[in-house]
Amino acid sequence: MKKWATLLAGSACALSMLSAPSFAKDDKELVFMNWGPYINSEILEQFTDETGIKVIYSTYESNETLYAKLKTHNKGYDLVVPSTYFVSKMRDEGMLQKIDKTKLNNFANLDTNYLDKPYDPNNDYSIPHVVAITGLAVNTDMYDPEDFQSWADLWKPELEGQLMMMDDTREVFHIALRKLGYSGNTTNEKEIDEAYAELRKLMPNVLVFNSDNPGAPYMSGEVGLGMLWNGSAAAAQNEGLPIKLVFPKEGGIGWVDNFAISSGAVNVEAAHKMIDF
């Protein structure tokens, strides 16, 4: 966890189905499935150098993809990284196994503000990995940020075919719910139906959905307005792109992605070592 924190400081602390990989065959291999933009290859190389464990690495672009892959190939994936609400869903469906925190020397160093949350009391099944916020990204060479201080501003008809949205059902519904004045975490079916109707109105304005590398459409100039993670916005700014991240008046979308061990893991020991790395 210490080394993860060092390499993720710039992105986190600035707070499709893929074919299944070859699965681990012995205790010197770890099958690790993670979000696309999270990893630095140096970490995997360093982990292998220090532990002798080879990492078989694959990525996904949404929690739904992760869920479907584990439903299809639960046996063999060792370490995965679901978001908060999917931790509880996957736990309840028997897709995750308990984490042995006695094997995590760095657990005591974690920020207690992100521990023992309702989706996983006592962190029995998950360990916080990345904490961030999704806001409203504005390319200031293309748009005036003062015109985009609310999620509702994305519904302006003159924005047809101009927006980048996260490829994440929960996050996209969140902004529609907040536009309507509802909680982003509501379970009220009427409110969710209303949000769905709002999203249908928004769709003509959407050019692209991307959660695999959401900064890329901004970096390429394909879009200049839409949703973006704060870490991706910081990376774009570091490259000299005139991106301003606005936290709308209804609030940004806070989220936590978590290390978790699949119930079908072959190399549980290696998974613990990677979490603690």
What residue ranges belong to the model's regions?
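A ligand-binding cleft/hinge motif common to bilobed small-molecule-binding domains
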Residues: 86-89, 219, 224-242
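Bilobed periplasmic-binding protein/Venus flytrap-like ligand-binding cleft at the lobe interface
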Residues: 150-157, 257-277
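Early extracytoplasmic/lumenal segment of secretory-pathway proteins
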Residues: 25-89
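Paired acidic/hydrophobic, glycine-rich loop segments that form the ligand-binding mouth/hinge
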Residues: 78-82, 207-208, 224-229, 244
